[in-house]
Amino acid sequence: SYADDMTSGLRPLTTLENISCYTFATPEVTQFDNTREALYNNIFNIMNPSDLVPRLPLASWGYARYGRDLWLPGYGDATFNDRYADMQAAFEENVGAECPYVPEDRAQVDAFIEKLGEQIPTQDDLVSAGGIASLIQDFAVGLDPVRVLYGHYPGVYIAWMQVIDADDLRSS
């Protein structure tokens, strides 16, 4: 992963304790099984629960991401209601437009990921004709990909990071 490459490149310059890498909206892109080793504890993946991108490819297909996963407040979380209006204001201040992100899409994203895992449980199933057809059907029913991608906007992540404290992040 890029985060791993960056932190590896800095290791000759300083000790590992002095290197931290923060990523945003990081998909699961490796099939190596060492992604949670202590060596990668300095990589922090900040993710939005309503963002589909960090949930793909599916972990059940054998994919993972390096480092520690930290989730922004999401619809239904205890800290969400306390911070959402502040996030919207920060977004508008930064971008000059209202925030199009729909946090309630978290339920649709959760349902889509669950259904996808049931219908296409393995990577081999994905590349089959039935897997491709199932994927297209899943996207066509009940999920507006353009609207869901609003949760992936960098401006949404930046606005959230401006209004929360470290305690507001949920680890997984």
Language-model regions, residue ranges each:
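Alpha/beta hydrolase fold serine-hydrolase catalytic domain that processes acyl esters and thioesters
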Residues: 4-172
